[in-house]
Amino acid sequence: MIVTQIAGKIQVIFGPMFSGKTTELIRRIKRFNFANKKCLLIKYSKDTRYNDNIDKSFLVTHDKQNYQAFPCSILEDVKEQAQNYDVIGIDEGQFFPDVVQFSEDLANQGKTVIIAALDGTFQRKPFQSVIDLVSKAEYITKLTAVCMVCYNEAAFSKRIVESDDIELIGGIDKYISVCRGCYNSDQNEGNSTKPSKTARHSHSQSAPSVAPLAVNINPDDHLNNDY
């Protein structure tokens, strides 16, 4: 008896703010589209940071790339619609309370699910749902940004406004990417790290360039399986 396996997969793209997670998500979705796969991109409905002059259904990156997306706050609401697609992309995955079960269910049905998410809060504490996804994912990509204080490689997000809320959506007006040294320096001094004037100016229109780090498995090496 021959048993046919349905090749569903979960891909996780994580890292700090301004590391290019959404840009990488859109790149992969475009690539699957080029391979004649039906793709659905889902965005967090409360994230409208860059939608001032564009429809709120579009997902917009820090450097103003945009892509048509379906906005929602609970993934279960779009689960039935997702059945009609081969590939499902999810941006800001850390904010969806049901992201783990949603991704696992669809992957078990033969879908490819790609999640872009922060791996930690501004306090460097993990988002548990993202950690849970790692144990269920076939492909994991960790991205880094550029430190907006010293220009070294940055693995952490630092909040520069006064708020203890975990969910505080914003761009460079509320966050900067920092390296370990600059993050710890701020903690020791007990005040908010501020990007240099040069850093703030140079990053006002676009995010720092992406610096991939510790890529465990590159999905591009598995074209025959994914397409």
Curated annotation (Swiss-Prot):
The reaction(s) this protein catalyses: thymidine + ATP = dTMP + ADP + H(+)
Any GO molecular function: metal ion binding
PROSITE patterns, per the entry: TK_CELLULAR_TYPE
Biased composition (Polar residues): 187-196
Residues reported in the UniProt entry to bind substrate: 122, 166-170, 175
Binding site for ATP: 15-22, 47-49, 91-94
GO BP terms in the entry: DNA biosynthetic process; nucleobase-containing compound metabolic process; thymidine metabolic process
InterPro entries in the record: P-loop_NTPase, Thymidine_kinase, Thymidine_kinase_CS
Keywords: ATP-binding, Calmodulin-binding, DNA synthesis, Kinase, Metal-binding, Nucleotide-binding, Transferase, Zinc
Binding of Zn(2+), residues: 147, 150, 179, 182
Segments passing through the bilayer: none
Top-level lineage group: Eukaryota
Enzyme class: transferase
EC number(s) given by UniProt: 2.7.1.21
Region (Disordered): 187-227
Active site, renumbered: 92 (proton acceptor)
Family (UniProt): Belongs to the thymidine kinase family.
Subunit structure: Interacts with calmodulin in the presence of Ca(2+).
PANTHER family in alphabetical order: THYMIDINE KINASE (PTHR11441), THYMIDINE KINASE, CYTOSOLIC (PTHR11441:SF0)
Name this protein carries in UniProt: Thymidine kinase 1
Organismal lineage: Eukaryota, Amoebozoa, Evosea, Eumycetozoa, Dictyostelia
Gene that encodes it: thyB
